Amino acid sequence: MSHTIRDKQKLKARASKIQGQVVALKKMLDEPHECAAVLQQIAAIRGAVNGLMREVIKGHLTEHIVHQGDELKREEDLDVVLKVLDSYIK
C-alpha cells in the first residue's frame, strides 16, 4: 500500500488546512490589512506547505528507499525525490 494512501487522512487534513489558509489570505487581500498581517499569513501558508511536503517526502524515503530491497529501484526512487527537492527549493 502506498504511503500516501495509508496516510491519506493525515495528508488530506494538512491540505485542508492549507486551503483554509489560502481562503483567509484571499479575504485579507479584499479588505484593508497591514502588510505585516498579510506577510504573516503567507508565511503560515508556506509553513503548512513545507509540513505537507516533509510528511510526503518522509513517507517516500521510508517506504521506497529504506525498505526497498531492489537496489536499482531504490536508486530510481531516490532520483525522483532529489528532482522534486531541486524543483521545490528553487
Curated annotation (Swiss-Prot):
| UniProt record, GO biological process | negative regulation of DNA-templated transcription
GO terms assigned for molecular function:
DNA-binding transcription repressor activity; metal ion binding; transcription cis-regulatory region binding
> Mainly localized where?
cytoplasm
Q: Which GO terms describe its cellular component?
A: cytoplasm; protein-DNA complex
Q: Name one Pfam family in it.
A: Trns_repr_metal
Q: Which UniProt keywords apply?
A: Cytoplasm, DNA-binding, Repressor, Transcription, Transcription regulation
Please state where this protein is localized. Answer: Cytoplasm
Stored Gene3D superfamilies: Metal-sensitive repressor, helix protomer
| NCBIfam families tied to this protein | PRK15039.1
PANTHER family assigned to the protein according to its UniProt record, in alphabetical order: TRANSCRIPTIONAL REPRESSOR FRMR-RELATED, TRANSCRIPTIONAL REPRESSOR RCNR
What's its job?
Repressor of rcnA expression. Acts by binding specifically to the rcnA promoter in the absence of nickel and cobalt. In the presence of one of these metals, it has a weaker affinity for rcnA promoter.
Q: Which family does it belong to?
A: Belongs to the FrmR/RcnR family.
> What name is this protein filed under?
Transcriptional repressor RcnR
